[in-house]
């Protein structure tokens, strides 16, 4: 699909996930920018009134809490961050509920951590709950549960969370609204030569190098985390648009097919929900390194991983474990469920499928990781 075809197809999008960052929602003081919040709500209400379903992933709890608590700098300790999040989350939801109710819409607070999505049963429950809210005409407002999460209070987590939520609800598009108008060839704030990239067909190392550093004083993200979120969402088959959260009408313009922001084109085929869950899985239990041919077969041709393509195994994992598949350079290209334990894979790596039984004394599968239990990330 070309950029133009993809942009025109967005007019048919019916389920939207919109992520808005701290730098868009707050003043430089850290206090909530109520004018921007109200404008954003009006734009989302317009989309609901047009027959679309909207999920809002919002940052800003820590920043809002800092503003209310009078903190001038980011908290340095985890308890301080969580205290700021606890104060700020209440402020955020109070204002969202007020603004949406002015237009007759109900909102629901949904606080998630990766652990909620890593467990298969909790993942399905989250999926069903969000689907029920959308059927009832409620706008789910999602944030990370910063008050109790430990690992999740880190740079860019809500960018990643928005991509995971987009996969969770089977969104038609993910919007990442930020304080820049998209991905540029240089920092548009400091460089007059910066040029907006209207379309990214593949996230290459060169694209990643354009990301620059972290975000503003109050935010925890930056362009790098947005690119990683785009990588994840597009691997699900969901297009991603990075656009300005400071300018009015960006969402509507994108949905009309206008060339606004930077669009990341999705993979042609949408990943099955089971495959998507693999991306939510807890920390992988091992790593399998493959040769260039196997990497190409997995990424380009959608093939299973066979023993002949394996060059190294790291970790002591059992059959059924979630493993990371990396290319010869060590870059993760896929994630999947291993059909054999690590010790067995080490013995059959580089060998032909027909030799598995002779080497191991048994042969349960032809593949190390079957394509039905594998999601391509790179």
Swiss-Prot record:
It catalyses: L-glutamate + ATP = L-glutamyl 5-phosphate + ADP. One of its GO terms (molecular function) is glutamate 5-kinase activity. The keyword Kinase applies. Pfam families: AA_kinase (PF00696), PUA (PF01472). Its EC number is 2.7.2.11. InterPro entries: AceGlu_kinase-like_sf, Asp/Glu/Uridylate_kinase, G5K_ProB, Glu/AcGlu_kinase, Glu_5kinase, Glu_5kinase/COase_Synthase, Glutamate_5-kinase_CS, PUA. GO terms for biological process: L-proline biosynthetic process. Pathway: Amino-acid biosynthesis; L-proline biosynthesis; L-glutamate 5-semialdehyde from L-glutamate: step 1/2. The keyword Signal does not apply. Substrate binds at residues 59, 146, 158. GO terms for cellular component: cytosol. Catalyzes the transfer of a phosphate group to glutamate to form L-glutamate 5-phosphate. This is Glutamate 5-kinase. It comes from Moorella thermoacetica (strain ATCC 39073 / JCM 9320). The lineage of its organism: Bacteria, Bacillati, Bacillota, Clostridia, Moorellales. The gene is proB.
